[in-house]
Amino acid sequence: MTVDISGAVGDAAKFGANAFVDAVYTAGENSEMFRAIAVHSMIEARMVKNDELDIVETAQGGTKIKTYKGRAVIVDDSLTVSGAGADRVYTSVLFGGGAIGFGGVEGNAFALGEGVPKVAAEVSRTAEAGNGGGMESIWERRTWMMHPFGFEWVESGAAMAEMSPTLADLRKAAFWNRVVDRKQVPLAFIKSKA
């Protein structure tokens, strides 16, 4: 699922077609399931320097979509970057249809798009509010979740920082268990320099 070329020497550590093809083919015969790649703007700049970025105009005209090897390019500078200066390592993400879903309700993992809070709704009353007339407030709680296809969330053996997972918790491999064959998971990652 992850192709890491960041430790290579010179240009071999930089994003390019070889790393892209290696990442796509971690899915074997399902390599065509990838429809988009999310990259940092520095990786997009590398694509431009390599003259590998194509611009496709939609059938209706007017809208242009950047593509790399037939996959739509999403540029987002909030993607993971580690290191500093020339040693920066950028994580690029390949996505297929259904890679990320909404879910959390047992038996309907991708249907409802929300979890089940401990107390989903309650009413509170403040008698002294409203010039003595009182006020009622309805509290409704929802836990919206995004979940990568093919993985289950496990809490055994690792302690979460809070009741709901934090971003730091979501980054820990100890909380994730892949439950379907790698070739069925529409996600792949490339770690490279720009």
Language-model segment annotations:
Residues A8-F15, D22, V48-A194:
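Sequence/fold signature of self-assembling virion shell proteins
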Residues M1, N18-K49:
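Structured, hydrophobic secondary-structure cores that serve as assembly/anchoring elements
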Residues M1-A8:
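Long, hydrophobic, well-ordered secondary-structure blocks that form the structural core
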